[in-house]
Amino acid sequence: MALEKIIRESLTGFLQCHIAHADLSALDEVFCAYVTGVLEELGSQNSSEEDFEMESFVEMLEGYIPGFSEISSEKVYDMLFELSGRLSEARGTENVSPNPTVEVSFMTPASPSEKTATEPLEGAVAQDKDDPKTGVDLLLEIFPSCTITQAQTALSMAKGDLEDAVQIIVDGKVIADNHSGSKDMQGAPKIEDLKDFILQKYMLVDTEDDKKTYRPVAPKEAPKKMIRYIDNQVVSTKGERYKDIKKPESEEMKKTYINLKPARKYKFH
């Protein structure tokens, strides 16, 4: 992670200096892995400037960052060799691990309390290197329905490789833990009991509404439009103030009407 951070910071500064509006969102893990491989080749003892393929490197970075091909190859060379030197120094500092307790042991004998204090620390360091709990926790985060025993068996089948363990669980090669499932099913309440409990506690039943009879309200009839004057003349001369006048209907419309009155009974003599 420290090496990737160094690469990301140096490339970000280099691009911001030479490309004003550079889109740095493409600097992902794949890009950093490619640049790391190129820098490892440059940092090797057998490599030289003639062996390095600058054109392919520029084409690759042009695909990630538009405008990279406009930067001169000399500046790119200087940046790459400087960055490879920084990475080699960072690797050297990581590989060298100081051990002050050994130097003190030559000068003064360690007390038993110091021994007991250093022993758990050494054990913790050894445990951090190969700690299966971290892999189990990651598997449980990825697969919440997976049990601890299933995650442990998947890690043991994958020999500690997390990606293989994930693939094993996805393929269903891990046998389900029937004992734990049966215990959970025995302790879990039934679905019908849960439904009754929820309905009894939270449902509001309006019993009075069931007793009422529904009587729909009759639609309101529009009042008839009464007319008093037509063409500035009184409609009726019988003393009515207003009168309802029906619109004249055509003969075709009258033919469509049906007479529902019973026919007259004629008596024949």
From Swiss-Prot:
Top-level division of the source organism's lineage: Eukaryota
GO CC annotation terms, alphabetical: cytoplasm; nucleus
Posttranslational modification: Phosphorylated.
InterPro entries assigned: CUE_CUED2
Entry keyword set: Cytoplasm, Nucleus, Phosphoprotein, Ubl conjugation pathway
Domain CUE: 131-174
Sequence segments annotated as region (Disordered): 110-130
Record keyword Nucleus present: yes
Compartment(s) where it occurs, according to its Swiss-Prot or TrEMBL record: Cytoplasm; Nucleus
Family named by the database record: Belongs to the CUEDC2 family.
Biological role stated in the UniProt entry: May play a role in targeting proteins for ubiquitination and subsequent proteasomal degradation.
PANTHER family registered for this protein in UniProt: CUE DOMAIN CONTAINING 2, CUE DOMAIN-CONTAINING PROTEIN 2
Name listed for the protein in its UniProt record: CUE domain-containing protein 2-B
Origin species: Xenopus laevis
Gene encoding the protein: cuedc2-b
